[in-house]
């Protein structure tokens, strides 16, 4: 094996400081996103109040779809995440194709920044939508230049704040639960077909844990932790959504 290949596969120059809970924060943060806001209404239209079941089924669908990555990351450390997996099994040509596709899809970061700005504008009336979006992108870019430790701390704080907020929202909502919530007239309104359609939609809202594979090179024990994180974060978030 050439020295260049050794350098590409070696992680001896990386800190490898990310433990299970650091990776879990990445997994949860990657799953929870705009899908829960934009698709839940469509799911309710398909299956009514059995949407809670659709979320759990959707989580299982997401795990099944990502099972190849779960299995692959249980046997080896892939320093470049998906890029390394593509390069290992398909060769340099397809690795280049993957890189070009990844570059094109990275423009969606601007969409996330603009969505953040939409939520932040009521609290920051002195700033425009574009300036807030540019500011958050710049802040996150600068954070990443300080290394993986800074990234992990910011990610952990963000996910803790996110989970606390959603927990409060869920707890308050459960106290206002209608006693007739599971009334057959409003449950599985379009039968098993409607439940399946809603589950497929909800699988998108429960997807995203695969991005934790990008942290393989910086993980302490990726073959143990990454598969567990992908499983537990997906199932945990899907059950949480169902509540």
Predicted regions mapped to residue ranges:
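Signature of the 12-TM Major Facilitator Superfamily
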Residues: 96-97, 153, 227-228
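Hydrophobic transmembrane alpha-helices that form the core helical bundles
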Residues: 42-46, 54, 63-145, 150
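Membrane-interface "cap" regions at the ends of multi-pass membrane proteins
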Residues: 1-41, 45-50, 62-67
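Short helix-kink/termination motifs in transmembrane helices of multi-pass secondary transporters
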Residues: 28-39, 107-111, 203-210, 242-243
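Hydrophobic/aromatic residues within transmembrane alpha-helices of membrane transport systems
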Residues: 19, 33, 72, 212-215, ...
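Lipid-exposed faces of alpha-helical membrane segments in multi-pass integral membrane proteins
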Residues: 28, 32, 53, 57-61, ...
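Helix-loop-helix junctions that connect adjacent transmembrane segments
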Residues: 9-14, 52, 125-128, 156-243
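Select transmembrane alpha-helical segments in multipass membrane proteins
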Residues: 16-27, 91-103, 132-136, 189-202, ...
């Amino acid at each position: 094996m050439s020295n260049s290949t050794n350098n590409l596969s070696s992680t001896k120059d990386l800190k490898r400081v990310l433990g299970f809970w650091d990776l879990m924060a990445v997994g949860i943060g990657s799953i929870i996103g705009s899908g829960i806001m934009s698709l839940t209404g469509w799911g309710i239209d398909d299956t009514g109040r059995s949407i809670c079941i659709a979320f759990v089924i959707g989580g299982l669908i997401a795990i099944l779809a990502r099972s190849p990555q779960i299995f692959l990351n249980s046997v080896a450390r892939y320093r470049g995440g998906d890029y390394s997996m593509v390069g290992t099994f398909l060769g340099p040509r397809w690795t280049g194709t993957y890189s070009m596709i990844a570059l094109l899809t990275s423009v969606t970061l601007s969409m996330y920044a603009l969505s953040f700005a939409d939520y932040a504008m009521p609290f920051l009336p002195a700033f425009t939508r574009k300036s807030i979006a540019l500011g958050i992108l710049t802040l996150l870019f600068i954070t990443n230049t300080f290394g993986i430790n800074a990234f992990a701390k910011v990610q952990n704080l963000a996910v803790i704040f996110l989970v606390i907020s959603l927990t409060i929202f869920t707890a308050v909502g459960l106290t206002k639960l209608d006693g007739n919530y599971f009334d057959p007239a409003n449950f599985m309104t379009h039968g098993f077909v409607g439940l399946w359609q809603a589950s497929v939609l909800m699988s998108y809202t429960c997807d995203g844990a695969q991005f934790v594979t990008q942290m393989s090179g910086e993980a302490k024990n990726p073959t143990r932790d990454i598969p567990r994180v992908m499983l537990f974060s997906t199932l945990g978030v899907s059950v949480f959504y169902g509540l």
